[in-house]
Amino acid sequence: MKSLLLLSVLAALAVAALCYESHESLESYEINPFLNRRNANTFISPQQRWRAKAQERIRELNKPPYELNREACDDYKLCERYAMVYGYNAAYNRYFRQRPGAK
């Protein structure tokens, strides 16, 4: 009985030691993950924002044809399902290519 009491006291101390909450966790942003607009804009300078937007526009304009075909296919559910089985190239050809003689 004495050993059971000693074991339970040791277990309680172990639980208390392992479950101790330090003050470091209170300093993190996990408590409030959402920032207001003013604080959110301080992370990236306007110069970096402008450069990122310009690079994104350039990437959108210079996409290879297979990427454009894939995006068109992703927007159409039947084409996307067909692509999962036969590939995006075959799916795009089936649903979006002009057929000979068709207008």
Swiss-Prot record:
GO terms for molecular function: calcium ion binding. Disulfide bonds join 73-79. This is Matrix Gla protein. The modification Phosphoserine is found at residues 22, 25, 28. GO terms for biological process: cartilage development; cell differentiation; ossification; regulation of bone mineralization. It is found in: Secreted. PROSITE patterns: GLA_1, GLA_2. The modification 4-carboxyglutamate is found at residues 21, 56, 60, 67, 71. GO terms for cellular component: extracellular matrix; extracellular region. It comes from the Eukaryota. The gene is MGP. Residues 51-97 form the Gla domain. Requires vitamin K-dependent gamma-carboxylation for its function. Keywords: Chondrogenesis, Developmental protein, Differentiation, Disulfide bond, Gamma-carboxyglutamic acid, Osteogenesis, Phosphoprotein, Secreted, Signal. PANTHER family: MATRIX GLA PROTEIN. The keyword Secreted applies. Residues 1-19 form the signal peptide. Associates with the organic matrix of bone and cartilage. Thought to act as an inhibitor of bone formation. Belongs to the osteocalcin/matrix Gla protein family.
